[in-house]
């Protein structure tokens, strides 16, 4: 079982080492995240490894995808096999076809670079992608128009339900069974 570093966003700034100790005591052995402020990737990886925590996935900002080699370097240093982008810039709640089209182009080109370097690129949804489009949603558009060889997905169950309804996670898993590589599940 793993945890997203964002879950501990209020703890890490106080003490990275104490936060990792808490994560270890919880029995968690995988962390999705990257080096915290004041630590290099090498130092952060060692702190995690010393506690039996691996880092299978790390994040990348949307703007970084135009030149993904720095994200490749960070991921390799951390030992991550997945790099996840969690946000497509858009205005307010108005996520448009044009936003989705730009993302598809960027995801395909960056995803190719990640694949060439032995890393799987994933996009993490946040609910705004579920605006109606043709016979589905803009999320369908993104999935259908990204190259499966280069782009995979990380479903956030809560955000998928928020944007698409209570049955949307199951629908998407059935509709695109081979595209989902990672999943966020929130416990309320």
Residue spans for each PLM region:
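Catalytic-core regions built around general acid/base machinery
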Residues: 43-50, 106-116, 172
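Histidine-acidic metal/acid-base catalytic patches
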Residues: 1-26, 79, 134-151, 155-188
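N-terminal pre-domain/capping segments
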Residues: 1-82, 152, 178
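An acidic, carboxylate-rich microenvironment
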Residues: 18, 43, 99-102, 171
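Active-site environment of divalent metal-dependent phosphoester hydrolases
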Residues: 38-40, 129, 160-161, 188
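Short secondary-structure boundary segments
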Residues: 35, 87, 187
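Active-site acidic/histidine proton-transfer and metal-coordination neighborhood
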Residues: 30, 56-153, 162
